[in-house]
């Protein structure tokens, strides 16, 4: 069942979202050659506590960390470790969520490590733009599939592929709620979006094949062909005034990331 949130609940989710925004922005400023993904995870966990929040991922279905840090061909759910250090030219996706006062916020950003190849810049840009286009469709009266169709159309127009095995989701008092928010499909299908719905919209886009596989750790998903992937995400509320990005401050406008 899709649960619509009250204005008060959405305000609480915005407070959780601001914690996510602030932590992710601190982490992406830390990204540099030689930094380990465990270094980033430790900061993510510490900052949640300083804000009176709880890291949403740690312990969720047994996940062992507060942050997902996925490098290059790793699509999502990369487990931080001391031995996994960033190198010049890498892409790293930072996916982070918190629970604050009983409500969740969730966002992700892909960050270049130093200078990256131009085709990786393009992959990041197209993925980020696909999120912008998806968020624009998160309006009352539209169909749920309009969101994913916007992602797929933009991504495939630029010669990249959309991951099917992992999708966005509803979010609220639980990290994952109904509905599933696909990043593909035909427009005009699924439930109509209503005021109070809150969606975690998160395109995952591969340079090569859309196919992925999960490593033996049971978490890290990688592209089947070893080519790089990018991932951007925001938590978005459907309101009377249009989409409201809850995982950034009210006074920030323009592109989602």
For each predicted feature, which ranges?
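Active-site neighborhoods and metal-handling regions in enzymes and metal-associated proteins
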Residues: 1-257
